[in-house]
Structures are given as structure tokens and as C-alpha cells.
Design a protein with these regions (language model features):
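Nucleotide donor/acceptor-binding cores
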Residues: 66, 145-147, 244-245
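Short, acidic/hydrophobic/Gly-rich beta-strand patch recurrent on exposed beta strands
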Residues: 83-86, 150-152, 281
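A short catalytic or substrate-binding loop motif that flags glycine-/basic-rich loops and adjacent residues
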Residues: 60-65, 74-76, 128-130, 198, ...
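Short, aliphatic-rich beta-strand segments
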Residues: 138, 145-154, 212-216, 316
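Short helix/loop segment immediately N-terminal to the Walker
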Residues: 123-130, 247
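Extended interfacial segments that mediate partner engagement and assembly in macromolecular machines
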Residues: 9-12, 20-123, 138, 142-143, ...
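Polybasic, low-complexity RNA-engagement segments
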Residues: 24, 90-99, 144, 153, ...
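Rossmann-like S-adenosyl-L-methionine
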Residues: 2-9, 160-162, 166-429
């Protein structure tokens, strides 16, 4: 089996031969240089709001991805190959060993290729729509050692599935569950609505910050649990969580941050729009024996708006929005509710900067800014920012939204914003 990763034994640094073709890694310099690059970017974009702490590195910046998706194809010799889709394309890049993926994944994938050949299971071809196995999903818990394998097929028929499962588990006894997901159509690397458990319980469990979480095939869960534990610890500490503190966990996903807050004594309300994730959050709360946390399947902005109209109050808002950041409406409702602290967990430094600018104008100041290197060898930077309420001077008129800020919010909808004209007039053509 050809290796795709080269290790410099003098430094311990690894290099990937697929770097230019794959797209999984975006940075190829040494890890110390990567950290310096990310620190400079964080300081450049966020230092206007407060002191930016030193980025938190990963002790061993390899094999950190606990979620691994692999696609299959046949080469010119009709040999089954495995790999990933090229960045921003549907062309597959053959990869036998990835330095970012959990070490347990690659040997399992190699065995699956052998079984596909032996049992005449053809890889699915996106161009022709022929074949069966679309891709595999392998999820691993670094804390419990549990491993889930999901076989995603274009049809409900899986030839010799009992023999397939028996052979796979025999070769890899570390596998604790195998799930067959049926996805007859849809985009690459997506899951279908129907799943059948072939072996084990159909889920695995992971531990994070002293709490236990159930992970099913479609669960929302951070792909680097080692750094996630650090990230969430910073968030909980910044929030000043203690017994009796009222917390809103907006964009809560499967409830990870909120459950950790509740475990530390807070009274937590979680809000999540995705039904499946909200359902998982409730299961996770029960798994940890918590009765001081509740979850609502709702849009975070609308939920906050309803709270504001009722005159509700709480102490801390924890928000972990998607890459697009928070909506203007959400921020407006958050400010109206006026919590003492807002803890913003961000996966996009660009939208974080935009949102912090708005919070600042509304009387919130950053008291803590902590970047975390969640995804080594990529450009991604996660940040935890703690905002605290400061009274705005009574005689200060509210600042107007700039044209540039309007463009940030309106551009995705295809609307344009004209620049203001001096003296309030516009020349006719």
C-alpha cells in the first residue's frame, strides 16, 4: 500500500504528497510557522476590540479528525481505489493514508476495499449513476475508543451484508457499531434519511469536559475533540458559570456547551433550529442526568425576539453560530435582552470581526479574546470572545451603520447599497 505521508524524523514534521491536489490541508509550512501566521491574522483582525491572547496550539497536530469520509472509485485497471474529492470539485484524489484523519480509519478503509472486491460491490459513479457504495463514514471517540462505520449506498440492497459485517468486525474488533445508510440521490458525501443498524447500537459515545455525548451517524459534533475540550473550557470559564446562573445556549447543536454549563450548576436553555440535532441534545441531557437544562427546536433569532417581547431576562448568552455568523436581528434581540455577558464561540474570524463591531456599537466590549488552533494545517481559527455590558454615554447619539457593513449583510441576498451623496442630494443623469 503506497504511503502518502512523509515524516521528517529530525523534526517530527510530516508532509503530504497530495497537498497540491487534495485540498484537505491548506498550509504546508512547519507547525510553528502555521501558528505564527494564525496569530498574526487574529491580532490583525481582532486587536481593535481588545487584547488577543496567544493562540492555543495542539500538542500533536496530526490524526485529529474523529470524523472521516472516504469515497471509492475504480482506476483505469479496474482496481478499486479510495480517497477524497478534490477541493471544490467532484474529481476524486486517491489517498491511502491521511495525516489529519484518526489513525484507526485508514486500515478499516483498506479492508473495506478488499471486501468490496471479494463480494463484488461496485463503487458508485457520480457521472453515470451506476454502482452501489457511495462513500463510508467512520466516526471515532478518542476518549472511549468506540468506532462507528457507516456504509452509504445508493440502494437498500447490500449484497452479502452479513458476511461483509462479520469479516469487517473480525479484521477490526475495535469497531463497536456498523450502520447501513441508504442515499439513493443527493450531493456527494451526504447521508440519506433511512439507516439500518447492522451491528452494535447504531451510535458511539464520547466524553468531553466531564460530560458524555451520544454520536449517531448524522450528529453535529466537532471533528477535533482534543482542541474542542480546550475551546469549551475557555468558554465556560469566560462565562463565569456557577450555580444558579441563567444561560441561553443559542445555536446549541447537540447541546455540548450548554450541557457542560449545566453540569457546572447553571440553569440552561438551549435553542437549535435543526430537529435532529435538538433531539440529540435532549438525549445527551438525559445521558448526563441533568434536569437543569431544556432545549427548544426553534430559530435562535425568533426565540430571542419572543423572549424580549415577554420581558424575560438571563445572565449569560452563549452563542456558537454557523460560519455565516449571527444575523442582524439576532444581535438586536441579544442587545435588547441585555445579558451581563455574551460568550461568542466562532469558527469564522471574518464574520466574528463583523459581529463584534456591531456589539461594540451597542455597548458591549470584549474582555477576553482567545484563539484556538482547532484545525492544524488549514487556515481555520476558532475563537472564544467574552463580551461584557458597558453603559453607553447618555449624550452620545447612536452611530449609523456604514455602507460597508450594510454590504456585508445585503450582499448574500444580491442587493446593492448606494453610497451616500453629500448634502443629501443625488445628481440626475
Amino acid at each position: 500500500m503506497p504511503k502518502k505521508v512523509i515524516t521528517d524524523h529530525s523534526t517530527g514534521e510530516r508532509k503530504c504528497r497530495c497537498f497540491k491536489r487534495c485540498g484537505g490541508c491548506q498550509l504546508s509550512e512547519s507547525y510553528s510557522e502555521q501558528l505564527a501566521r494564525k496569530q498574526e491574522k487574529a491580532a490583525r483582525m481582532l486587536s481593535g476590540f481588545g487584547k488577543v491572547e496567544d493562540i492555543v496550539p495542539m500538542e500533536v497536530p496530526y490524526n485529529y479528525r474523529c470524523k472521516v469520509q472516504t469515497v471509492f472509485a475504480t482506476d483505469s485497471s479496474k482496481r478499486i481505489i479510495s480517497g477524497v474529492y478534490q477541493s471544490n470539485a467532484r474529481k476524486m484524489v486517491a489517498v491511502d493514508d491521511c495525516m489529519l484523519e484518526a489513525e484507526v480509519a485508514s486500515p478499516i478503509v483498506q479492508t473495506i476495499k478488499v471486501l468490496m472486491k471479494d463480494m463484488r460491490i461496485r463503487p458508485y459513479d457520480l457521472r453515470t449513476g451506476e454502482g452501489l457504495l457511495r462513500h463510508t463514514l467512520i466516526r471515532t471517540s478518542f476518549s472511549t475508543g468506540q468506532v462507528m462505520v457507516v456504509l452509504v449506498t445508493a440502494s437498500s440492497m447490500l449484497p452479502a451484508k452479513n458476511n461483509f459485517v462479520k469479516a469487517l468486525v473480525k479484521a477490526h474488533p475495535e469497531i463497536t457499531t456498523i450502520v447501513h445508510n441508504i442515499c439513493p440521490n443527493g450531493m456527494p458525501l451526504t447521508l440519506g434519511e433511512r439507516s439500518v443498524v447492522l451491528y452494535g447500537k447504531g451510535y458511539i459515545e464520547d466524553e468531553l469536559c466531564g460530560c458524555r455525548f451520544r454520536i449517531s451517524p448524522a450528529s453535529f459534533y466537532q471533528v477535533n475533540p482534543i482542541q474542542t475540550e480546550k475551546l469549551y473550557s475557555f468558554a465556560v470559564e469566560a462565562a463565569g458559570i456557577r450555580k444558579g446562573v441563567k444561560v441561553i445556549d443559542a445555536y446549541c447543536g447537540t447541546g455540548t456547551i450548554g450541557i457542560i454549563c449545566a453540569k457546572n450548576g447553571a440553569e440552561v436553555t438551549g435553542v437549535e433550529l435543526n430537529k435532529s440535532a435538538c433531539r440529540d441534545a435532549k438525549v445527551n441531557a438525559e445521558l448526563n442526568g441533568l434536569d437543569n437544562i431544556s432545549f427548544f427546536n426553534d430559530d435562535a433569532g425568533k426565540f430571542m425576539q419572543a423572549m424580549a417581547s415577554r420581558g424575560d431576562s438571563f445572565d449569560v448568552l452563549v452563542m456558537d453560530p454557523p460560519r455565516a455568523g449571527a444575523s442582524r436581528e439576532f444581535i438586536g434581540c441579544a442587545v435588547k435582552l441585555a445579558p451581563e455577558k455574551i460568550v461568542y464561540v466562532s469558527c469564522s474570524i471574518e464574520t466574528l470581526e463583523r459581529d463584534l463591531r456591531i456589539f461594540k456599537k451597542e455597548g458591549y466590549r470584549a474582555t477576553f479574546i482567545q484563539p484556538v488552533d482547532m484545525f492544524p494545517h488549514t487556515m481555520g481559527i476558532e475563537n472564544v470572545v467574552c463580551l461584557e455590558k458597558f453603559e453607553k454615554p447618555a449624550d452620545k447619539a447612536p452611530e449609523k451603520v456604514t455602507v460597508q457593513e450594510k454590504q456585508v449583510f445585503l450582499k448574500p441576498r444580491g442587493r446593492s447599497v448606494r453610497k451616500p451623496v453629500k448634502n443629501g442630494t443625488r445628481r440626475r443623469k
